[in-house]
Amino acid sequence: MTLHSNSTTSPLFPNISSSWIHSPSDAGLPRGTVTHFGSYNVSRAAGNFSSPNGPTDDPLGGHTVWQVVFIAFLTGILALVTIIGNILVIVSFKVNKQLKTVNNYFLLSLACADLIIGVISMNLFTTYIIMNRWALGNLACDLWLAIDYVASNASVMNLLVISFDRYFSITRPLTYRAKRTTKRAGVMIGLAWVISFVLWAPAILFWQYFVGKRTVPPGECFIQFLSEPTITFGTAIAAFYMPVTIMTILYWRIYKETEKRTKELAGLQASGTEAETENFVHPTGSSRSCSSYELQQQSMKRANRRKYGRCHFWFTTKSWKPSSEQMDQDHSSSDSWNNNDAAASLENSASSDEEDIGSETRAIYSIVLKLPGHSTILNSTKLPSSDNLQVPEEELGMVDLERKANKLQAQKSVDDGGSFPKSFSKLPIQLESAVDTAKTADVNSSVGKTTATLPLSFKEATLAKRFALKTRSQITKRKRMSLVKEKKAAQTLSAILLAFIITWTPYNIMVLVNTFCDSCIPKTFWNLGYWLCYINSTVNPVCYALCNKTFRTTFKMLLLCQCDKKKRRKQQYQQRQSVIFHKRAPEQAL
């Protein structure tokens, strides 16, 4: 947009003439020009709204009517879109439970900062430009600047927090994600706002009392202590160039790590296909353990103390009869493993939506499958790397050897019967470490040697192989889903960072140039550069909608006023389910 003035001085920059050339005495940024958090002009081309003959009483500030209409219409549309977009983000977070994730808490904080800019900063700045003077008084000026700077600083701080959160989530999934809760996210968001407030609000509001006088002329509004180009440039370095550099480096690391995960997952799926035609015993690799520890130092400490134990997983099975018919039935019903509790238990304990490979620990693991009626030990050492449930010997829980001996003795009493019990509900799958004791010599011989495999019945071998393949498939599926979520989060982050860099860079380049060439930047460019920084708050909700399908569908639902319909459908569904339940209850009682 192009703004003109009837006076010889610029209506936006008091020390810039109509030809935009400074005299030597006017070196540096104009009196009314200060950086907005080191990134854009808070007086924003506000200027010394007075002509050489005295203050102007023109409410249009020397602009024509059509210029005022154009400026008011354009900036009003931008402010309205900013307000509506960020309100949609906040309301969507409130009404849609699927959006209440840790990632979106940071986006919610960013939306609050953008909403403040759209409601307060944009409109006051538009009035400032149109009237060519600040007509609301000194207190309103200082409050506006304080709110504007705090909200903008909070936006940058939130972007930094989001970048670090994504980086640690991908590079340290086990250690960081265990601590990554909504409470911790709230603390980080609170710190971002508190730091922003402490950095800017006291200095803006009370600087005139610190120095003993107010040097901002009447009719102008700018930060008193940011009047020198060198100070302005210093704040730009600290507030824009450094954060952008840090965020760019973090995003590059996130991108490389995501690409690495994609290749690993492709190899994992390929090895899973080969495993279906081979034995389920594979060489081990790195990372996951059922105890969720990943620090090798802790593992070595447990090894030095020579503590041994095992991790138990239980699953429910059907009644088992040791007959050929039952064996044939079990052999043909591989799909029944899809719905048992073992799959769910291992799936939940071995992987989650927000867990990935984070440890470089290399170890050999063994699974001991003990079935009632048989003391056969199935050695399944060297499970596949990050895909299977791996239990380092040093990380297993401590178990008293006497209790283990009692358990073996109890199982032996069942063996004396010569047959399986007619029905049982629990089968223990025990992940055991080597125990160098005479009482468990049979266990030690099979676990301690990674190549020894005792003869198994056809039934046991089939069940064990199915179990291993099902577990592998489920963990692979979990990892694939987790990778998809990470990619979506990375896409949202990349869109936000790209919008931030595009909208904030032009003004900060002008700040850099103005430090060395104070007459090179036209006043109109200062205006556009500052407004472009404000437009970042307008673009952010669009980034959320483009990169997140849940946000997009929720926005559509809110804009079309479909919230009540969705609630009614949900209530009707719950009522139907309640009626069905009450109808079935008497029948089951009979």
UniProtKB/Swiss-Prot annotation:
GO terms for biological process: adenylate cyclase-inhibiting G protein-coupled acetylcholine receptor signaling pathway; G protein-coupled acetylcholine receptor signaling pathway; G protein-coupled receptor signaling pathway, coupled to cyclic nucleotide second messenger; positive regulation of smooth muscle contraction; saliva secretion. Keywords: Cell membrane, Disulfide bond, Endoplasmic reticulum, G-protein coupled receptor, Glycoprotein, Membrane, Phosphoprotein, Postsynaptic cell membrane, Receptor, Synapse, Transducer, Transmembrane, Transmembrane helix. It comes from the Eukaryota. The modification Phosphoserine is found at residue 385. Residues 92-104, 165-184, 253-491, 547-590 are cytoplasmic. Residues 334-345 have a biased composition (Low complexity). InterPro entries: GPCR_Rhodpsn (IPR000276), GPCR_Rhodpsn_7TM (IPR017452), Musac_Ach_M3_rcpt (IPR001183), Musac_Ach_rcpt (IPR000995). GO terms for molecular function: acetylcholine binding; G protein-coupled acetylcholine receptor activity; G protein-coupled serotonin receptor activity. A motif (Basolateral sorting signal) lies at residues 275-281. Belongs to the G-protein coupled receptor 1 family. Muscarinic acetylcholine receptor subfamily. CHRM3 sub-subfamily. This is Muscarinic acetylcholine receptor M3. It comes from Pongo pygmaeus.
